[in-house]
């Protein structure tokens, strides 16, 4: 029997996926927001239960040879979650932590995120427990070629369009696309995040970071303030954090921190364009650590083994967690509120724990959840798909303008939906309800499939 009540739905989740910690956390957060919908219209409860099951989960081995001639084996995944709105769309993550729970959580979030963009994209996610760190270019290439040799059977421009994520940047996308083209003998938009020279879109590398800042800007406007002059703590130092910093500098905010898995750098004077350029060189070309930033700028403080939320001292206004899931704890959130935290715009996927989100709401912090605030990346991926389908390439200015419009539309949907259901300024609830209803109604209209 399908679940008919909220209690039965929660029991089903615990029974089927109780061991999948990250997935359960993501689902329970959404269920909490959707209770108001389920109480008004119980017909949506069995639809949500059906939505929890991926349409398809593909697991495969990835054998590859290292530079010493040894055969290594990693595990590859693709979770094709929901295609009610369009082809499966979502990134590939290469990281030792990758498992089915993490990919199901990311794929589930991707369904709602893609729905919010209003672009015709379903939800999916994939990756491998392969770690590109410490590997030579040739080793990464051989792994990517082996990975795509199996994945190519399951993807396509009208079926499933992967992109990058943690551990999958421009280099990896290039190797993956080259192998797909070699095997299928077709030049098509099967991946997004491609180089602009061969089918990519301008602003795609910048899109997630830029989009999160645009969402933060809209939150500020909605609360009668401006982003200019705000002190912002960033975590991470990869693609998302770098371009969030770039846009924050352009809009007049002050960025005070960056981090990686080893520690955090704090610059009380704020990062300017020159400092950001050096950080980009360290991370993108030298593939170094943020601790090396201190070699050129000795006035910067470095905190070994610390996150920005644990070591920053001083007045601040906003945080943009751009590293990984569950990086901001309830204790971190409480500490940040004491330092003046007023706005959170998430650049990473689910970077705040449930306890941290509870603190945000309890203390009146304006919270932009990942599925809304970091949707810029997949939005421009959708625009890349559109450009590929008609063999056109828009200018950077055109894409940035479209991105800003999409992020504005996402914010308005979150704001208006939250207000409609009696929870004004609860952008998290607005995002969950608006994203869910579009997918759920589409599933109802398409029948039992």
Swiss-Prot record:
Protein name according to UniProt: NADP-specific glutamate dehydrogenase
Oligomer and partners: Homohexamer.
Family annotation (Gene3D superfamilies): Glutamate Dehydrogenase, chain A, domain 3, Leucine Dehydrogenase, chain A, domain 1, NAD(P)-binding Rossmann-like Domain
Organism field: Giardia intestinalis
Family the UniProt entry places it in: Belongs to the Glu/Leu/Phe/Val dehydrogenases family.
GO annotation, biological process: glutamate biosynthetic process
Active site: 125
Any GO MF annotation of the entry: glutamate dehydrogenase (NADP+) activity
CDD domains: NAD_bind_2_Glu_DH
PROSITE patterns registered for this protein in UniProt: GLFV_DEHYDROGENASE
EC number: 1.4.1.4
Reaction(s) catalysed (UniProt annotation): L-glutamate + NADP(+) + H2O = 2-oxoglutarate + NH4(+) + NADPH + H(+)
Cellular component, GO annotation: cytosol
Any one Pfam family match given in the protein's UniProt record, by short name: ELFV_dehydrog
């Amino acid at each position: 029997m399908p679940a008919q009540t909220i209690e039965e739905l929660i029991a089903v989740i615990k029974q089927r996926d109780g061991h999948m910690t990250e997935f359960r956390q993501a689902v329970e957060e959404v269920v909490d927001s959707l209770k108001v919908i389920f109480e008004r219209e119980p017909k949506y409860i069995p639809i949500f239960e059906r939505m929890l099951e991926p349409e398809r989960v593909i697991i495969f081995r990835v054998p590859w040879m290292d530079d010493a001639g040894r055969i290594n084996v990693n595990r590859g995944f693709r979770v094709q979650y929901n295609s009610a709105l369009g082809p499966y769309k979502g990134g590939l993550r290469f990281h030792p932590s990758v498992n089915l729970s993490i990919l199901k959580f990311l794929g589930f979030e991707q369904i709602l995120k893609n729905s919010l963009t209003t672009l015709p994209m379903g939800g999916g996610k994939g990756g491998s427990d392969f770690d590109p760190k410490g590997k030579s270019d040739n080793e990464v290439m051989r792994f990517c070629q082996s990975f795509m040799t199996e994945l190519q059977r399951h993807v396509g421009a009208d079926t499933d369009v992967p992109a990058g994520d943690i551990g999958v940047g421009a280099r990896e996308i290039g190797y993956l696309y080259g192998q797909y083209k070699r095997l299928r003998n077709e030049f098509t938009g099967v991946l997004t995040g491609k180089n602009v020279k061969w089918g990519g879109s301008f602003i795609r590398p910048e899109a997630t970071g830029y989009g999160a800042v645009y969402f933060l800007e809209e939150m500020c406007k909605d609360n009668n303030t401006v982003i200019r002059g705000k002190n912002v703590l960033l975590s991470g130092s990869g693609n998302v954090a770098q371009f969030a910093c770039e846009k924050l500098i352009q809009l007049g905010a002050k960025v005070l921190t960056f981090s990686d898995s080893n520690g955090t750098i704090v610059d009380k004077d704020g990062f300017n364009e020159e400092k950001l350029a050096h950080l980009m060189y360290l991370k993108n070309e030298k593939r170094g650590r943020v601790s090396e930033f201190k070699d050129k700028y000795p006035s910067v403080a470095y905190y070994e083994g610390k996150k920005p939320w644990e070591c920053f001292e001083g007045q601040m206004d906003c945080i943009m967690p751009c590293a990984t899931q569950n990086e901001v704890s309830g204790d971190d959130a409480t500490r940040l509120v004491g330092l003046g935290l007023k706005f959170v715009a998430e650049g990473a996927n689910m970077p705040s724990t449930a306890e941290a989100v509870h603190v945000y709401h309890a203390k009146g912090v304006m919270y932009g959840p990942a599925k809304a605030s970091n949707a810029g990346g997949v939005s421009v991926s959708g625009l890349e798909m559109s450009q590929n389908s008609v063999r056109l390439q828009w200018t950077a200015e055109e894409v940035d303008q479209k991105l800003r419009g999409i992020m504005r539309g996402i914010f308005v949907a979150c704001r208006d939906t939250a207000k409609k259901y009696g929870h004004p300024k609860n952008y998290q609830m607005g995002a969950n309800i608006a994203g869910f209803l579009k997918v759920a109604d589409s599933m109802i209209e398409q029948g039992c499939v």
